[in-house]
Amino acid sequence: MSKVWVGGFLCVYGEEPSEECLALPRDTVQKELGSGNIPLPLNINHNEKATIGMVRGLFDLEHGLFCVAQIQSQTFMDIIRNIAGKSKLITAGSVIEPLPPDPEIECLSSSFPGLSLSSKVLQDENLDGKPFFHHVSVCGVGRRPGTIAIFGREISWILDRFSCISESEKRQVLEGVNVYSQGFDENLFSADLYDLLADSLDTSYIRKRFPKLQLDKQLCGLSKCTYIKASEPPVEIIVAATKVAGDQVQLTTEPGSELAVETCDVPVVHGNYDAVESATATTAMSNQNLPNTTPLLSSPPFSDCVFLPKDAFFSLLNVTTGQQPKIVPPVSVHPPVTEQYQMLPYSESAAKIAEHESNRYHSPCQAMYPYWQYSPVPQYPAALHGYRQSKTLKKRHFQSDSEDELSFPGDPEYTKKRRRHRVDNDDDKEMAREKNDLRELVDMIGMLRQEISALKHVRAQSPQRHIVPMETLPTIEEKGAASPKPSILNASLAPETVNRSLAGQNESTDLLKLNKKLFVDALNKMDS
């Protein structure tokens, strides 16, 4: 079985990390590389029980600190081989044609696309005698910019993926790598499937993982021909029925680029309801003559629908609605009939109209209007309506001060009910509401005064005069000074490990203690 190599940058000199402690100056790297602190162990996500190989070389290149390592654990490779055989994503193969099919390399690239360097903290002066570089890890995503791991069978193939590495630097790396594999102790890899599953679960909850991998890939100048599927999520392709009548989306896009859309005009189709069938037949025949087009998406066999672009649909709809004849209702010779009044024969209606309105309106013309109807009922007199409304406003209604409290005959509150005018204006309602709120506030203040006076009386009878407040919790600075800082810095991202339930309990406990302290201070001030 051929060897498995991994290469990538552990830091990029031209990019500043998000945290100041992750900064790794170039002079420090050159100084530590001269000390000969190589080889280093290669593990998974800084887990010393999951050591899978050794680092074969660290190189100070113009772009950054480059690392070449070899995976030597056969136990770990057996696990990767079994996972790759059951993964549907890896079984489907690579979308990019130049890449040779290699399930093991694809599984490693998808699971551990990041590199992380564990080094000594620069500000720590107590670790002068210990080596600066501790180990290198493959992880889900690195904390430093540009830390992408490229897996492959040959070192030269890995170096060709990086466009930021010059030809002279590639020769330098190939000459400096220790290709002679030494013996590897399989006992160094004591992790099991549960450890790998827990690691993948933690990696899936890292925020902004995919954007970080895409940015790292751009910083390293990686070519498109890589096995890293985490940084290139598949794009859902939605292709229209035809290229002439719709939109077409490109199959693949570069990271950060916009989807290219090609549109064209839709010819106007003349006809009535047969226009849909003719347009569909025309576009289907035109697709056969178009070269280099994306194959059409066939409609499901159980569906009778036809895929039609939006522009073609609206154009056909406009043509169809424009050619339909407009139906104009015929003009009636007779005047409109009011449905709310009953039509009567000529003899009855003429007699009633003549009885009430013959002197004012005279008799109607029988030749023009062959039927008769009642005249409309006169409207309700506005003056009478205004009089009744003003009379209603003068009424007074009994209303208690509180709707929640009930009173019965014989109670003292029953005879003290106030009479208030009925309020119809919004401003008056708002003023009444504010008065009620103010009255409730005054009552609450009076109750608080009574309780405070009762507490004073109780405390005056007790032998202890003052209450000793509880001890306050330590501040953030005191906690930082009490807890020791780690001496080894691991540059791999991990999800937040704060227990939210415990944090909520601590916050509620702190708030309760703070309220007790404020209440005790207020009582002491009132006594003094």
Curated annotation (Swiss-Prot):
Keyword Hydrolase: yes
Any one GO cellular component localisation term in the record: host cell nucleus
Region Disordered, annotated ranges: 394-431
GO MF annotation: an example: identical protein binding
One GO-annotated biological process of the protein: nuclear capsid assembly
Positions of the UniProt region annotated as Interaction with major capsid protein: 508-528
Annotated catalytic residues: H46 (charge relay system), S116 (charge relay system), H135 (charge relay system)
Location of the region described as Interaction with pAP in the Swiss-Prot/TrEMBL record: 270-288
Chain positions of site Cleavage: A230, S231, A491, S492
EC identifiers of the protein: 3.4.21.97
Listed name of the protein: Capsid scaffolding protein
Organism for this UniProt entry: Human herpesvirus 6A (strain Uganda-1102)
